[in-house]
Amino acid sequence: MNPRRPLTPETYYRLPWNLADNSITWLEPTTKCNLYCEGCYRENDPDGHRPLADVIRELETVRKLRRTDGISIAGGEPLIYPHIVELVRYVAAQGWKPIINSNGQALTPALVRDLTKAGLVGFTMHVDSHQKRPGWIGKTELELCELREKLANMIYEHSGGTVACAFNATIYRDTLDDIPMLTRWAQAHMDRVQTMVFILFRSVKAQAGFDCHAGGKPVDVGQLVYHLDHMETHKDILAQDVADKIREIDPDFEPCAFLNGTEDPRSMKWLLTLKVGDKDRTLGYLGPRFAELVQVFHHFFWGTYLAYTRPWLVRTAQALFPLALFSKSIRKVFLKWLKEPGKWTDCLHIQSIMIIQPCDVFEDGRQNMCDGCPDAILHKGRMVWSCRVDELVKYGTFITCTPRGGCCGTATQATPAESGANLPAEAAGTLPAAKPEAPLAVKPEASAPAVKQEVKAPAVKEEAPAAPIEMPAAAPQAPAPPAAKPKSAAKSKSGKPKASKAKGKK
């Protein structure tokens, strides 16, 4: 087996998204849903449909707070919202790209046609084996590919190929090994599936060794919708784990851009890869400079960072070949393409693979959220993480975490900065007593509790008191430093409440 090849965020393009200027903004016209998804972080409200006028007022406020390319219409299940076509039409009329995040259960050919006419730009379909979907309960990820193909074909055929199609899958420990198969499936349908998204499961853990508070008052995180008793021992999956799985079938797999965390600048919360090829072959991967060029170019000419594109733009990768003079990654693709003249007329596609790593809770209680998250939603006049709204609804503020027994008292693992787990190899090697490879359950971000910058003193290290040193009478003015007694650096162990980013849709 090939040794793990570490991801190198220092070589990737840091996506320029931020709170005020982003590619996407989240919108929930309803919190009513027609499915139960184990990874969902929104409570199903049978009376959750909002008046269209209220939703439009929310969008008017969003315009004042945030520049955005696309509006992700989610929920709940947006396809059962009675005004979904009118809402899509309104969003498109404002110059935004309407994108629907759906479980696909209510999708019909007629609805695809109506939404296409209203100006819909893209669908993101959430399908995975932990959903309680009638007729599909108990099916494996492989068996669910039949449903994925049915939805992709419906979107392609009834939109005339003008609406982009993406698929989300929440990844759990028991489905991690399905990633190579899902990656192959997505490539086999590059002509109809423009994006594949892997969302790494998170849930709040009530028994993770933390005391949780909201506004200074103790709270029971077991009351949150994203707490699942049977997931208390679930080990968090990291972006590196997903990359390792993809590299089992494609050793050349290499991301090009990422979004970091609020606490760990090297954590890869949104990790983007751009693959060039067709259903039978991969010609290569586009590099960081290309990702940067696309974002900067789009922002310069259209004033926003790029979200979704129309499918025809990613069906003609040959149009990029003139840039081979300036781009090493495009040059590699071009040279590989030249070696097969019999396929020069075949259509080349660009397919995005996005890995989303939700909230990481460190041993000192800090919560590592997405810095500049695209899925921010308006809540009571401010933009907040959509995956944490349940905390705001129940407690009026985000939850904060403190290790039981004092700082790091019951922690099981150190933060990446202390362990060297998320540092470049050369830097990690300089740290004392480095812990073995990247902690598997120590990072990730999802809708976990607290992310309010209530600076809980990051892992305060307890310093063993050192006996004062007697100084020579001749030099009273220059006290020597205390005897070099080693710090008893509180080694941490991890306990981490978390939540799921796995919205039953996106």
What are these regions (language model features)?
Residues 1-26:
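N-terminal [4Fe-4S]-dependent radical SAM core
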Residues 2-4, 47-58:
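Non-heme iron-sulfur electron-transfer modules
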Residues 17-53, 65:
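Canonical Radical SAM [4Fe-4S] cluster-binding loop centered on the CxxxCxxC motif
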Residues 56-73, 81-200:
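Radical SAM/AdoMet-radical enzyme domain recognition
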Residues 133-149, 153-343:
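Radical SAM enzyme [4Fe-4S]-AdoMet core and its adjacent flexible, acidic
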Residues 297-439, 505-506:
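Flexible mid-to-C-terminal extensions adjoining Fe-S/redox cofactors in radical SAM and related proteins
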Residues 440-443, 448, 452-506:
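Long, low-complexity, intrinsically disordered segments
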